[in-house]
Amino acid sequence: MELASAHLHKGQVPWGGLLLTASLLASWSPATTAEVTIEAVPPQVAEDNNVLLLVHNLPLALGAFAWYKGNTTAIDKEIARFVPNSNMNFTGQAYSGREIIYSNGSLLFQMITMKDMGVYTLDMTDENYRRTQATVRFHVHPILLKPNITSNNSNPVEGDDSVSLTCDSYTDPDNINYLWSRNGESLSEGDRLKLSEGNRTLTLLNVTRNDTGPYVCETRNPVSVNRSDPFSLNIIYGPDTPIISPSDIYLHPGSNLNLSCHAASNPPAQYFWLINEKPHASSQELFIPNITTNNSGTYTCFVNNSVTGLSRTTVKNITVLEPVTQPFLQVTNTTVKELDSVTLTCLSNDIGANIQWLFNSQSLQLTERMTLSQNNSILRIDPIKREDAGEYQCEISNPVSVRRSNSIKLDIIFDPTQGGLSDGAIAGIVIGVVAGVALIAGLAYFLYSRKSGGGSDQRDLTEHKPSTSNHNLAPSDNSPNKVDDVAYTVLNFNSQQPNRPTSAPSSPRATETVYSEVKKK
């Protein structure tokens, strides 16, 4: 039988395989001296595909060559034989009808099955009947079907249960590689992840809600890749501590109270509301229209998971407040002399309201001269200065409203001739004046002594603080413009005559008194 011209079953030989075979056979050129080798194209064959056992360096002077299945030349394992001299093909006992033998020694297998995998022997007989053999091996792999993920626990509980996921491939698992991914990221062994030998089974220890997935297992062999459908775990958890929104806890009468409660839970939690510890509604939201101050109190959201048996609560205190009324500002005197004191009082009927002070429509910046009462209702300025002149207001507020008082303008009376010097500057001036007077007095004494003849004259330099009876140079203490006497320096110049006999009566000494006055206003 001439195998090279044998007809193939319809649809069994892909055109791509035949074209590849033709290309390989056309490019083959025999060599006379090289060793015969055989190449399986491809070496890893997908089931139901073709494989070509391509011979290299086939000798030219051959009487015949034959292919055998296995590493043998037993007659019952012969597939086909070719005789070059007669260009004839013959089939053997192992021929399946899917093989084609070529004159260059190559053998084409069509529609490969798993049973075809193994070793094949080419037996060559030369013209002198000497026989040589060459062998080749190829592997056949199944086309992988889509795998499927199964779980040993369909409803694991967070923190309590572990789960094993198994990738079922429906083919021989020994020749398959398994890869796992979660949320598109590759998984490997870790603290809570364990993989079986071969990676076919993935175990999650002490599952959490973050282990939900989805999971995908991927199967690989040398000829194909396939992936499972995404698989997600139904992890039971919760409820977490509920959150009540919105965050507002103060409302004014006439508004609507609308509260919503949420707690993470699987399955979804059951919700209950209690007002002042009394059951009110079994819903996730609570709505009370047109509230009054009687609606103030504690609002409790109670949640329960019927599967885990866990419950959680959150309490929110709601206060309904009346808007504040306008405060009234009063003052001891709106026209104040500089360095006097003034007291402003903010009057309000709203107990517990917050009080703030404003100066020229801006928040008042307190100085060391300003003091506030414990509840901020009284502002005292002592002493008051000209920069304190302006408009004052008080502002009261509660969490739902704010009101400002009437405006009071403070006028400050001050002496325009006053420079407004500090106490330190005044003290410096006084010291300077006293020192200047003393210097002038000393200079006058020196000049007078020289003019009177040097050391013959005596000078009496004294300092007194004359009484008001003798030297009442300052205004009366009762004067509105009181002036304080600081010091008086009294210079007494006693002119001495030359010494005279003791019998002669001494004439009175001429005395001159000079006053220098330094005053502090």
Swiss-Prot record:
Disruption phenotype: Knockout mice exhibit impairment of insulin clearance and hyperinsulinemia, which cause insulin resistance; develop insulin resistance primarily in liver. Display normal white blood cell, red blood cell, hemoglobin and platelet. On the other hand, mice have a high number of neutrophils. Display also increased thrombus growth, and enhanced susceptibility to type I collagen induced pulmonary thromboembolism. Spontaneously develop systemic neutrophilia.
Signal peptide: 1-34
Positions of transmembrane segments: 429-447
Tissue: Expressed in granulocytes, lymphocytes, granulocytes, B cells, and T-cells. Expressed in bone. Highly expressed in liver and femur. Highly expressed in neutrophils, and to a lesser extent inmonocytes, and macrophages. Slightly higher expressed in peripheral blood neutrophils (PBNs). Intestinal T-cells predominantly express isoform 2 while extraintestinal T-cells mainly express isoform 1. Expressed in small intestine and colon.
Biased composition (Basic and acidic residues): 457-466
Locations listed in the record: Cell projection, Microvillus membrane; Apical cell membrane
Membrane topology, Extracellular segments: 35-428
UniProt cross-references to PROSITE patterns, sorted A to Z: IG_LIKE
Keywords: Cell junction, Cell membrane, Cell projection, Cytoplasmic vesicle, Disulfide bond, Glycoprotein, Host cell receptor for virus entry, Host-virus interaction, Immunoglobulin domain, Membrane, Phosphoprotein, Receptor, Repeat, Signal, Transmembrane, Transmembrane helix
UniProt region (Essential for interaction with PTPN11 and PTPN6), positions on chain: 515-518
SMART domains on file: IG, IGc2
Disulfide bonds: 167-217, 261-301, 346-394
Annotated Gene Ontology cellular component terms: adherens junction; apical plasma membrane; basal plasma membrane; cell junction; cell surface; cell-cell junction; ciliary membrane; external side of plasma membrane
Expression triggers: In intestinal epithelium, up-regulated in the presence of Gram-positive commensal gut bacteria. May also be up-regulated by interferon gamma (IFNG) and TNF (TNF-alpha). Isoform 2: Expression is promoted and maintained by the mucosal environment. Induced by IL2 on natural killer cell.
UniProt domain Ig-like C2-type: residue ranges: 147-234, 239-319, 323-411
Subunit comment: (Microbial infection) Interacts with MHV S1 spike glycoprotein. Monomer. Oligomer. Heterodimer. Homodimer. Cis-dimer/oligomer (via Ig-like C2-type and/or via cytoplasmic domains); induced by trans-homophilic cell adhesion through an allosteric mechanism transmitted by the Ig-like V-type domain, and is regulated by intracellular calcium and calmodulin. Interacts (via cytoplasmic domain) with calmodulin in a calcium dependent manner; reduces homophilic cell adhesion through dissociation of dimer.
UniProt remark on domains: Ig-like V-type domain mediates trans-homophilic cell adhesion through homodimerization and this active process is regulated by tyrosine kinase, PTPN11 and PTPN6. Ig-like C2-type and/or cytoplasmic domains mediate cis-dimer/oligomer.
Job description of the protein: (Microbial infection) In case of murine coronavirus (MHV) infection, serves as receptor for MHV S1 spike glycoprotein.
Protein name (record): Cell adhesion molecule CEACAM1
Source organism (scientific name): Mus musculus
